[in-house]
From Swiss-Prot:
Methyltransferase recorded as keyword: no
Keyword line: Cell membrane, Membrane, Phosphate transport, Transmembrane, Transmembrane helix, Transport
Domain EXS positions: 607-807
Stimuli inducing this protein: Not induced by Pi deficiency.
Pfam families: EXS, SPX
Functional note: May transport inorganic phosphate (Pi).
Cellular-component GO terms for this entry: plasma membrane
Keyword Metal-binding: no
Name of this chain's protein: Phosphate transporter PHO1 homolog 2
CDD domains, sorted: SPX_PHO1_like
PROSITE patterns xref list: EXS (PS51380), SPX (PS51382)
């Protein structure tokens, strides 16, 4: 793989504009190559010289010079070449002169008088610009993580004091304990010098389990530097040992418990309890309660904060390494093209720069590792490093095979189903309408689920193809996000079992042996639905447990809106539910059909119940009400008026859906429906559809920008073909108005009414799948524009001084 592709594949996608523009520098080198080819014609082809083969063959009998050359065995030619190159650099004969100024790195090209020198001068100017830009960005990010490190230091002080308070509520007698520890350090200073000479370093380190959590942060004792000191020479003077012992004992003192007087528990209002307390302005909401439950919550929050902070450090380390490597590669290409030796002096300056010498960052990484292992992994290095550096998932061949196998099963079952319906009369014509009004809504639920999962898998495929960091956008834990193969496997598996149930149902209808067990025949879709629900909530580690629980958590947040803090996965799932209104109605029909015993006689008496009719309004409006409440909470917390307008969009949709439901019920139960209800349903639906379409294009997709360099689109596009965006907008409008069928009562003669409703619902799901890609693409480009590659993590403690700054 060429380095340009390797760089683009390994870079942090949200920082892609901050990396060195390697392709642009290569274009400058290509211009130099073109100039060289014009001025210097290619050399004539090489012809073999008589005796050349013999002389080359004679070299096979020379004495072996060794794999590693010693100074005495170096050849004279290499010594002369090394000497000449050193002279070139030392005497100023190098082609460039690199210096450091207040504006950054500046390179003076010393051979502009040569032919084509102006092209090389432009190359080095652009190279300096790229380096200074990269180093400036790197400095800013390092300063940010250093500020975060200071904040984490304060959080660790508070955590240790909190831990001491919980595990020793009576108190330790801090002043007396300090005096005793100081006196003890003085008494054992002399004996320590003798013991240290004969005791290994690992044995000298005190490691009582009871005090492992109580001592102050002394992770530096585990660093390589101190290990080297332990294996070095033994101190000879007693005074040195006494001083080191005093410092060690002073560092081993417990954290000052007075820290707890200056902190408060950070109430993020992320749960219903904290939200209700925040609304009621409870005076005790920030009071610290010292118990084991609060300690565990604080440790979990701080543990998550350390994991995210460590990921920041790793990304910065990768950023530094890739950019330094890019400068090295491009300079080697320059040397090869121009036959100069400019890379040595330039890379020497790069290595000595802030970007090249990342010692401060490396020490911080080691410090974070040792701190995390000690305080959050109980001293187990492997356990701690597995949390800090989760292993990347490998694509398994059995997943690909299972996906293809299940897809083949679906295709075969569909062919078999069509053949059975066409060739065998499974039921009389009179029972066909009853079957479509009862069993079809039950089985269509699985069709909606499979179609939505398939559309999501297609989205994942194209997100990966265009390098959209969807895992970061959705907040997935590293290594737990599903690929499109895994998602397709889930969807095709559900589809296979659903089609098996349909075929089983039809077979039991015509089989004389099973025809008497009609209630059992009707229960097949219910069994499948219950099985899917059981698998979804099963706590065992199989079938993507983390993803299942992540989905259930987001679903709970949608149902309990606005009590939970709204995150992108929550409102993204809420938008998906707005496209599954027909599926929610199917679930409502499940409750009615099986709860009231209609399945025993295959009768649909649900529509005769007022409770069921009212539930249709609630079920159809529930997803939009959830999104409305989420928008209201975001408007209050973020003080964003756009969220208020977004809430108006969902309010209009709730009104439109309710009026369409009422009109559909009136059409079904009365011969002459009132015209004013039709007008209200149609006008409200048109108003809501126009508002939603405008919001999709402008806010969710970021399109229709007149001033953009891509007219009527946006400045940055991941798909190079602009026509794709215009086609998507047209399709979105067409599919958005698919609900017109419910108002105009337009029906196809060859389709049953339930089939028509299923087709319209499927079109809405397909529109949502298309919407998903461009919505996440726009979110990714916003992250790229703001260089946002990290998640903001709430910390468990607030210091009084921080509150004063906020005030």
């Amino acid at each position: 793989m060429k380095f340009g592709k390797e760089l683009s594949s390994q870079m942090v996608q949200e920082w892609q504009q901050a990396y060195v523009n390697y392709d642009y520098l290569k274009t400058l080198l290509k211009e130099i190559i073109k100039l060289k080819e014009k001025t210097n014609p290619p050399p004539p082809p090489h012809h073999a010289v008589p005796g050349e083969g013999i002389s080359r063959k004679m070299t096979l009998y020379r004495a072996f010079s060794g794999l590693v050359q010693t100074p005495g065995k170096k050849r004279q030619s290499s010594r002369q070449s090394n000497y000449s190159s050193e002279i070139d650099i030392e005497e100023g004969k190098a082609p460039i002169l690199v210096s450091k100024s207040t504006h950054g790195l500046e390179t003076t090209f010393l051979m502009t008088a040569e032919e084509g020198g102006e092209y090389e001068l432009v190359f080095f100017r652009r190279l300096d610009d790229e380096f200074n830009r990269v180093e400036k960005f790197y400095k800013e990010k390092v300063e940010e993580v250093m500020k975060d490190a200071i904040m984490l230091n304060k959080q660790m002080d508070a955590l240790i004091a909190f831990r001491v308070k919980v595990e020793n509520p009576v108190g330790w007698g801090w002043e007396e304990r300090t005096v005793e520890m100081t006196r003890l350090a003085s008494d054992i200073a002399t004996s320590t010098a003798a013991i240290a000479a004969s005791t290994p370093a690992r044995t000298r380190t005190m490691n009582p389990r009871a005090q492992a959590h109580m001592e102050a942060i002394q992770e530096g004792s585990f660093s390589r530097e101190n290990e080297d000191e332990d294996h070095g020479s033994v101190r000879g003077a007693t005074g040195d040992v006494k001083t080191s012992s005093l410092n060690t004992m002073r560092g081993a003192r417990p954290a000052p418990i007075e820290v707890l007087d200056h902190i408060k528990i950070n109430n993020t209002k992320a749960t219903p309890r904290s939200t209700i307390k925040g609304v009621l302005n409870s005076s005790s909401q920030n009071e610290i309660i010292f118990n084991r439950q609060n300690l565990n919550e604080v440790e979990e929050k701080l543990k998550f904060a350390f994991v995210e902070f460590y990921q920041k450090l790793r990304l910065l380390k990768s950023y530094s390494f890739l950019n330094v490597l890019a400068f090295s590669k491009i300079l080697k290409k320059y040397d090869k093209i121009t036959s100069r030796n400019a890379s040595k002096s330039y890379m020497k300056m790069v290595d000595n720069s802030y970007l090249g010498s990342s010692d401060e960052l490396m020490k911080l990484i080691q410090r974070v590792e040792s701190t995390f292992i000690k305080h959050f992994a109980n001293g187990h290095r492997r356990k701690g490093m597995n949390i800090l550096r989760p292993q990347m998932k490998r694509e398994k061949h059995r997943v690909t095979f299972s996906t293809g196998f299940s897809a083949g099963c679906i295709f075969s079952l569909i062919v078999a189903l069509v053949a059975i319906i066409r060739t065998r009369k499974t039921m009389p014509e009179a029972e066909h309408n009853t079957y479509m009004n009862t069993m079809f809504p039950l089985y269509s639920l699985f069709g909606f689920i499979v179609l939505h999962i398939t559309m999501y898998a297609i989205d994942i495929y194209y997100w990966k193809r265009y390098r959209v960091n969807y895992a970061f956008i959705f907040g997935c834990k590293q290594g737990t996000e599903l690929g499109y193969r895994q998602v397709l496997f889930l969807g095709f598996t559900i589809g296979t079992f659903a089609l098996l149930c349909v075929l089983g149902n039809l077979d039991m209808e015509v089989n004389p042996k099973t025809k008497n067990f009609k209630p059992l025949t009707e229960l097949l879709p219910l069994f499948l639905l219950v099985a899917l629900f059981v698998v979804l909530i099963m706590p065992f580690h199989f079938l993507y447990r983390s993803t299942r629980f992540f989905f259930l958590t987001c679903l709970l947040h949608c149902l309990a809106a606005p009590l939970y803090k709204v995150t992108l996965p929550d409102f993204f799932l809420g938008d998906q539910l707005t496209s599954q209104v027909q599926a929610l109605r199917s679930i409502n029909f499940y409750i009615c059909y099986y709860g009231w015993g209609d399945f025993k006689k295959r009768q649909n008496t649900c529509e005769a119940s007022e409770i069921y009719i009212y539930s249709l309004y609630i079920v159809a409006s529930l997803p939009y009400l959830s999104r409305l409440l989420q928008c209201m909470r975001r408007m209050i917390e973020e003080r964003s008026l756009d969220q208020g307008y977004n809430g108006v969009k969902y309010l209009l949709t709730v009104i439109a859906v309710s009026l369409r439901t009422a009109y559909g019920y009136e059409v079904k139960n009365t011969k002459n429906p009132t015209s004013h209800l039709k007008v209200l349903a149609g006008s409200s639906s048109i108003l809501a559809a126009v508002f939603c379409t405008y919001w999709d294009f402008v806010h969710d997709w970021g399109l229709l920008n007149k001033t953009s360099k891509n007219r009527w689109l946006r400045d940055k596009l991941l798909i190079p073909q602009k026509k794709v965006y215009f086609i998507a907008m047209i399709l979105n409008v067409v599919l958005r108005f698919a609900w017109l069928q419910t108002i105009l009562n337009f029906e196809f003669e060859f389709l049953h009414k339930q089939t028509t409703l299923a087709v319209v619902a499927s079109l809405e799901i397909m529109r949502r799948g298309m919407w998903n890609f461009f919505r996440v693409e726009n979110e990714h480009l916003n992250n790229v524009g703001k260089f946002r590659a990290f998640k903001s993590v709430p910390l468990p403690f607030n210091y009084d001084e921080d509150d004063e700054k906020d005030d």
